[in-house]
Structures are given as structure tokens and as C-alpha cells.
Amino acid sequence: MSVQAWTIFLAFLLFPVAVCGYECYVTPCTRDVIIVVDGSSSMQTSTYISQEINVITKLTYSWTLDYSKVRLALVGAYFGNEFNGLDYFTDSSLVEKRLQSFRLAAMQYGLFNGDFNTTVRFLDERYVGQRANFGPRTNVQKRIVIFTSHSGEKDIASTKNTLQKFGQLGYSVTLVGIGVSEDVYKNTYYHKFVTIQWFELGSVAQSIIDTITEEGICFLDQGWTTPKQEICTTTPTTTRAPTTTTKKSTGTVKPATTPKPVPPTHAPFPVGDYQDCSCTTQSLYIDIVFVVDVSEGMGLGGLMMVKAEINTLVGQMSLDPEIQKHVQVGLIKYSNESEIVFKPSEYTNEDEFTEDLWTDPRLEDVDEKTDEVNLHLALQQAAKMIGSMRKGVKKVVVIYAASYNDEGDDDARQIAANIRESGYEIITVAFVEPESSSLVMKIGELASPRMNFTSFRDELLVDELEDALCQVNCYCPNGWKQLVLEDRKYGECFFPTKIDASWTATKFECPILSKEHTGNGHLVYVNSALKNTFLNKFYMDHWDPENQEKPNYDIGLSYDKATQKYIWVNGVTNNPYSNWAEGHPNLSKGECVMSKQEAGTTTDFKWNSINCQTDSGRGLCQEAACDSDFYCPPN
């Protein structure tokens, strides 16, 4: 697939054939759109600018650009301390290259001071005014979308007259405020204001993209009416919108669409008050190998989206080996052959990695000479690379694939199984078009549990991938068993004590057993039937009948005389779950609690009251997992 893949999303986004107040929902959509990218020091860092560009990529990468339809002009404000604004694009492939040049300028030259007034004056001189270099088409609705982080109220207020003139000339201006509130812009003039908070910039919700599209671009200007619905003809090689035929009907006419493939179905996460693994991307301590499909099936637009996603992910991590918790990253590209692009040892700075991600000629375009792929070969290289990385550090292979072949020597299933059996995780992202539903299930076969994802080319999966990487980064100290429920890892680890002792003695033993980690170990907290079953099975698996008569274990529950309540050692008093044996609790037998195996069963345990001082047994200790909050040295 070529750059023409960019056109598909907007065809569905902008061209439904329902009669409404949005002309873009009728074929054909015609707009002249100007988008301003803020590259000033108000954006704070080049990482934020890169994320801003990712948002614009997500907004525009599938638009159908054509002189008779949508034209798009991109303005770079203060990149390299200057303004960059060329004529309207009618070729989608040039859009991403232009955005890429802005991204690189921010990384290479740094950020420069700027103001909102100068940005507006540039628009007036270059695009809007009577002497503009690049004027609009006649009888076409005109839109300006300004991404801005400027916050000087006097500076902003000084643009009111100019922006009012824009409106009088037919330009509707939408302001996308990054890290600033609409109140700062109350003294200027605009059609729509959309806010993106700094913390949202790395993974902007689709609802924000939809708002910009629908209320900033696709609405109808006053005096414009919905034109007659037309047939948009298409051939297999055109970049036009999909064919939509209007039929006589008394109801609403709907467009002919191709259903999207069903994404991999992950069961909902278990319901319960379990300790999640902490997930601070900057504090990850893992090794990552990205494996990227650059075959014709990916298309240039797809490759740029993959790079944007990798940029966003790695840009939030630390690659500095001087920092205790840091990441090593490698990258392999493949089509019918594979090639190592970045070796893990080459980068100690995330900015250097992301800059090379956009400048390395090996990642500038897809391989249009072939639509064949050999993921098996790429995974062989990935296995060798990841095996040579840091010892004792958790590792993951992240596969981005737009095509897949599971036949003959190209079958990647066995090598993927070998990677997983070596203790490494595999994340798959099926980067698909609507007709590629078979790819979803097939590429997902290679993934670790709950780590197969699907991108429909109209959204980044940053949140999902961050969570998956944090799952890789979540594990237990040596000898401890992690809580895993329905293939979801949690930040809870368990360890059985090895000698018989009273409940009170065991209570003090747990912190000692965890002293090499957090030192906050305690007798186990049982708060669901699902967790109870997990713990019973774990204890039975580690029960030594020769040294312990029965597989009973102390839990962290005891009666508090002062409050006259049962309290867990972690302070919980309102645990909704209980598992008392018949006739219990029974204070006459004691104030502490042991989980005892029911007679005639192997895995059925019930809670029994015991004497805290005289009844002896083993305990089951609980401790926090190693994750982005709690560091564990390499094993």
C-alpha cells in the first residue's frame, strides 16, 4: 500500500451522507484549511512539540487532499526562530514530511521566544490579506486552526481586530490551547476554543480530535447550505473517497461502508481492590526491541504513525545509564528482509534516539518494491539482540505489522514461542485497514497474554502500550510469587514462611523477609474469592508435607478489642469479602485468623479463629512488586 492509504480515514470521517449541518459529511467535502504549529518556547520542551505534531498527524494524516476537495497549508511558528508557511498542499505525502521538518527543527535548533500577535500577522500577510501570497479558492469555506501555548493576555488581546477581519473574510478560526485556558483568550476573537492539557498531549483523546474536526472544520458557514448529495466515483487505483450512492428512500440515507475488523478481545480486568503495578513511564527499567514492518502494506502514512507512536513512548522514558531506572532500546525494520537500524548500545539519551528516528534514511519510506514480509527473519534478529542486552532486566519485543505471512519458512510462530519461553514478552500491534481483519487474529497469536493490540490507522495506542510496558516492568523479587488474575499482573507478591510459629511471631517475620525490597511485608490480605483461590493454589503448590502436617496458613486478620472489629494488618476494616468456616469467627478460640484446609478437599480453605500466642503454623506474607515505584536490582 502506498501513501494513498492516508485517504481512507477522512473518507469515512468526513463523508457520511446524512443530511445535517456539516457539509464535510456530504460528498464531496471542500475546505481550505490552515493549521499553525506552535514551535515557540511557550511549548516548554521539544518533547511537547513532538507530541503536538503527533496530534496534528492524528488529525490530518488520512485526509483526502485534492485541489477540488481539501487543501491544507501548514505553518510552523518559531521553528528555527522563523515562520515557515508554503502554499496549500494537495498531496498527502508532503504533509508528513513538512511536519517532520518542524519536529527536527525543534530538536536541532531548540525553542525560541515568540508571541501570538506575530503569528496572526504572519497569517494575514501570507494567506488572508489582500496581498497574500497564497490566497483561498473562490466559493470554498475557509478554516484556520491555530495550536497555541501563548499566555500573554495583552499580546493575545492585540490580535482581536485582525482575527475579526479574518472572520469577515470568511475564515473561521479555531484555537487549540495547549496548557492554557480559554479565559486567557477571552479578549480576542475566534470561532471555537479547544483545550488540551499538558498531561493530555502525549495521548490526546479521540473526542478532542473529533471536536476539532466537526466543530472547527466541518461545520457549515452561515449562508451555506448542504449541497445535493453526489456520487463519488472511484476505481481500484484512485485516492478518492469510497463510492457512496444515493438512493430514494423515506429514511436517512447511509453511506456504504466496509466494517472495521474486530480488535482482539481482551477480557475485562478482574473486579477487585487489587494493588495495580505502578506505571511511571520515566521510571521504567526494561529492555525494548521495536520490530517495524516497512513493507508496501504499511504505507508511508502508516510508517509515520508508527514512528510518532514510538517517539511518544521513548520520549517519556530515560535512556541515561547514569540513572538507576533506565531503558535500553533497539529497532529492527523488515519487509521480505530485515535490518538492524538502531543497536541498543548506541543511545544513552532519549532525544538522540527520537531525532534519529525521524532523520535516519532507512526509516524515511516504506519498501515499495515488495509487499512480501518475513517476520520470522526479523524475530530471529530480535531474539539475538534482546538476548545480548542487560542480564536480569525484563525484556520485550514490540512488533508493528501491517502484513503477515504464516506459511513455510516465513512462519514466525515458533520463533515467537521460543522468545516467550525464554522469559521475554511480545507485544503485537496489527496496523490494519478495514479489509485486513484476518491479520488481527494471526499476528495476535505471537503476543504474550493481553498484549495483542490493533491500530485502525486513525488512532495512536500510547495508553495501551504504556500499560503493556508497565506490565513487563512489574515482577516480584526472587522467590516471591506474583498475583496474576486472568493474565493481568498486579503489584502484589507472596512468600510462605518456612517454620512453624505463632500468629504474632509470623506477623513480625514478614517485614524481615521483605527487608531487601521495601521492608513493608505483612501477612496476606485476602479481599476476593478470585484472590483466595489463587492463594490457596499457590500455597498447595509450595506445601511440604514432610515438614508441615497440614497446608494451613496465617492470614493478616485479627480482632481489635479497642474498636471491637476485625482489622487487617494493612488497616482495612471494611473488606467486603470473607471466607469464614462454619462456627467462625469464634472469639473463644482466639482473636487471630488462619486459613485451614477443609477436610476431604485439596484446594478448599476456610478461615478459622486461632489463639494469637499458642496456636502455631506457617504464615503467608505479602509484599509490593518491583515496578516503576519500587526498584529491584537485576537478578
Curated annotation (Swiss-Prot):
Keywords: Disulfide bond, Lectin, Repeat, Secreted, Signal. Its main location: secreted. Disulfide bonds join C592-C612. It comes from the Eukaryota. It is found in: Secreted. GO terms for cellular component: extracellular region. Residues 32-215, 287-472 form the VWFA domain. Residues 233-257 have a biased composition (Low complexity). Residues 1-21 form the signal peptide. Residues 233-263 are annotated as: Disordered. Residues 489-621 form the C-type lectin domain. PANTHER family: C-TYPE LECTIN (PTHR31024), C-TYPE LECTIN DOMAIN-CONTAINING PROTEIN 160 (PTHR31024:SF13). This is C-type lectin protein 160.
